Regions:
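Bacterial Sec-dependent N-terminal signal peptides
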Residues: 1-21
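Substrate-recognition/specificity elements adjacent to catalytic centers across diverse enzyme folds
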Residues: 22-223
Length: 223
């Protein structure tokens, strides 16, 4: 019993440490292009600041991602979100995250907690921008569920689930004579008449939406 008490006490002490984010230790400076340069005393401070910058720039899209990852997108967009909600249930995102969450390092969990605090604080100060109240408060586990769904979709497994429900699964769906590819072109300096070499690639990333890239400069005094 004594060991159990000590373990519980240690858990709450660690949680308390993780939750101590002082916004005064965080500075967000945007350059002429709007790119946020985020300064903080610790990695957790910077994560909190990054969450705040994300929300300033596109709170709606980030919420939609988390709604899908937690199986409640249909509460926002109706039947159009039912497919994503169904996939989240089929792949058992919640059960998988609950099972594997404790395998994450304490340092990483601290970063997740700090980021979620930044999101929750923004939602608290701008409640009119919240899409679905049930999504909040955001927790590290809710964030991890969205990451799990993203990995599933990035590997094309969502299309397989769709084929299964439509009874349209083919034995050769992994291999095809008409497989798509991508191009990368390297331009030598001698070819372009400049003392530079260029590499043209297609990152297959859209300019907006949940899979678009985001530029930020993170500076932590922690290292």
């Amino acid at each position: 019993m004594k060991n159990l008490f000590i373990s519980i006490l240690a858990f709450f002490n660690i949680s308390a440490i993780f939750c101590q984010i002082n916004p005064k230790n965080i500075e967000i400076v945007r350059d002429q292009y709007g790119v946020p340069h985020i300064y903080g005393k610790t990695d957790a401070d910077v994560a909190y600041g990054l969450a705040w910058a994300h929300r300033e720039d596109d709170f709606k899209t980030i919420q939609e991602g988390y709604l899908a990852g937690n199986g409640v997108l249909s509460k926002h967009i109706g039947l159009k979100g039912a497919g994503a909600d169904l996939i989240t249930q089929v792949i058992e995102s919640k059960e998988t995250v609950d099972k594997l969450y404790n395998t994450l390092s304490p340092d990483f969990i601290e970063i997740l907690q700090a980021y979620s605090q930044g999101m929750n604080k923004y939602a608290e100060e701008f409640p009119e921008k919240v899409l679905v109240k049930k999504l909040f408060p955001i927790t590290p586990k809710k964030m991890a569920r969205y990451s799990f769904l993203t990995l599933f979709i990035d590997n094309g497994a969502d299309r397989l689930v769709s084929d299964i429900f439509q009874n349209n699964v083919k034995n050769d769906f992994f291999f095809s004579d008409n497989m798509n590819g991508s191009n990368a072109i390297a331009l030598n300096s001698k070819k372009i008449g400049k003392n530079e070499t260029f590499l043209a690639i297609n990152p297959h990333q859209p300019f907006d939406g949940p899979t678009s890239w985001y530029e930020a400069h993170l500076i932590s005094e922690q290292g």
